Each structure stands twice: as C-alpha cells, then as structure tokens.
Amino acid sequence: MTENNPLKKISLLNPIHLLAVGFGSGLIHPAPGTWGSLAGTILGVILLSLLGVKIFLIFTALCFLLGCYLCQKTTADMGVHDHGSIVWDEFVGVFIVLAAIPSLSWQWILAAFALFRFFDILKPFPIRYFDEKLENGFGIMIDDVLAAIYAVIVVFAIQYWML
C-alpha cells in the first residue's frame, strides 16, 4: 500500500526534495498549493526587504532555473507528474508578483498572494495549455510564471488607476 503513495518515495533529508516541497509547506493539507504560496510569500517578503528589488529579481530568476531541475527530479523520484506537494513553482510565482508591488505594506502583500493564487487556480489561456502539455520540470515551473505575469498585470493596473 505504501508503494502507491508517491510521498513515501521522497525524503525531507534530501535537499532537492526539501526545496521542491517548499521546506515542507507543500505537505500541508488541504490545499498544498495555497500553503506553499503562503510560505513563499513570507520568505519572499523577508528576502525582498533584505535584498532589494534588483537582487531579488536575479535571485528569483535563479530560483526558476533551479526549480526546473528540482521539479523534474522530484517528479521522477515520486513517479507522478506535478504532484500537489511540489510547490517550488508557487514560491517562484509569488516571488515574481512580490517584486512588482509598489510597497511591502500588508495590503499589497495580501494582493500579491491573492492575485497569484487566483490565476494559478483559474489557469486562463495559455496557462492551462502549458500545464497540460509540458510534462517536465520546465512545464511545472512555467505555468506558475504565467500566472504570476497575469497577477503582475493586475497589480500594474491597480497602481495606474490609483494615481
């Protein structure tokens, strides 16, 4: 019975698996993607406040590249494509949106989190297409990047209308 549970095939002692499941946040149920996004938001706010936007964006790009490998390796180890517990892609997606908000006020942080989750769950075109067609680490990562881009567009629209 345990052989059918993909979570039994990973170890939090393995740094690849630990990062892929968002330091364990992707193991929280229900809604592991939401828990992963929340953990990513908290980490992202801390890093953004310490690094500044430019360095944070470079860090985020590196996290995307690393995530392609982490997600590919962990899905291969689990034997399941894009298992819900893999939330590194949520971390990167919410990092992108956090980099676009004008301030680290609780309102903007909440907006970044909520908008990212909305588009990540809804998966408007072409997000769903990439989510379904690209069955590799890049595919796991890119749908969240696209969801983040949708969220960033809304953040910019809100900023424009607030002026």
Swiss-Prot record:
<keyword id="KW-0812">Transmembrane</keyword>
<feature type="transmembrane region" description="Helical">
    <location>
        <begin position="92"/>
        <end position="116"/>
    </location>
</feature>
<feature type="transmembrane region" description="Helical">
    <location>
        <begin position="137"/>
        <end position="157"/>
    </location>
</feature>
<feature type="transmembrane region" description="Helical">
    <location>
        <begin position="10"/>
        <end position="28"/>
    </location>
</feature>
<keyword id="KW-1003">Cell membrane</keyword>
<keyword id="KW-0472">Membrane</keyword>
<keyword id="KW-1133">Transmembrane helix</keyword>
<dbReference type="InterPro" id="IPR007686">
    <property type="entry name" value="YutG/PgpA"/>
</dbReference>
<dbReference type="GO" id="GO:0008962">
    <property type="term" value="F:phosphatidylglycerophosphatase activity"/>
</dbReference>
<keyword id="KW-0378">Hydrolase</keyword>
<feature type="transmembrane region" description="Helical">
    <location>
        <begin position="35"/>
        <end position="51"/>
    </location>
</feature>
<dbReference type="GO" id="GO:0009395">
    <property type="term" value="P:phospholipid catabolic process"/>
</dbReference>
<keyword id="KW-1208">Phospholipid metabolism</keyword>
<keyword id="KW-0442">Lipid degradation</keyword>
<comment type="function">
    <text>Lipid phosphatase which dephosphorylates phosphatidylglycerophosphate (PGP) to phosphatidylglycerol (PG).</text>
</comment>
<dbReference type="GO" id="GO:0006655">
    <property type="term" value="P:phosphatidylglycerol biosynthetic process"/>
</dbReference>
<dbReference type="InterPro" id="IPR036681">
    <property type="entry name" value="PgpA-like_sf"/>
</dbReference>
<dbReference type="GO" id="GO:0005886">
    <property type="term" value="C:plasma membrane"/>
</dbReference>
<comment type="pathway">
    <text>Phospholipid metabolism; phosphatidylglycerol biosynthesis; phosphatidylglycerol from CDP-diacylglycerol: step 2/2.</text>
</comment>
<keyword id="KW-0997">Cell inner membrane</keyword>
<keyword id="KW-0443">Lipid metabolism</keyword>
<protein>
    <recommendedName>
        <fullName>Phosphatidylglycerophosphatase A</fullName>
        <ecNumber>3.1.3.27</ecNumber>
    </recommendedName>
</protein>
<keyword id="KW-0479">Metal-binding</keyword>
<keyword id="KW-0460">Magnesium</keyword>
<dbReference type="GO" id="GO:0046872">
    <property type="term" value="F:metal ion binding"/>
</dbReference>
<keyword id="KW-0595">Phospholipid degradation</keyword>
<dbReference type="InterPro" id="IPR026037">
    <property type="entry name" value="PgpA"/>
</dbReference>
<dbReference type="Pfam" id="PF04608">
    <property type="entry name" value="PgpA"/>
</dbReference>
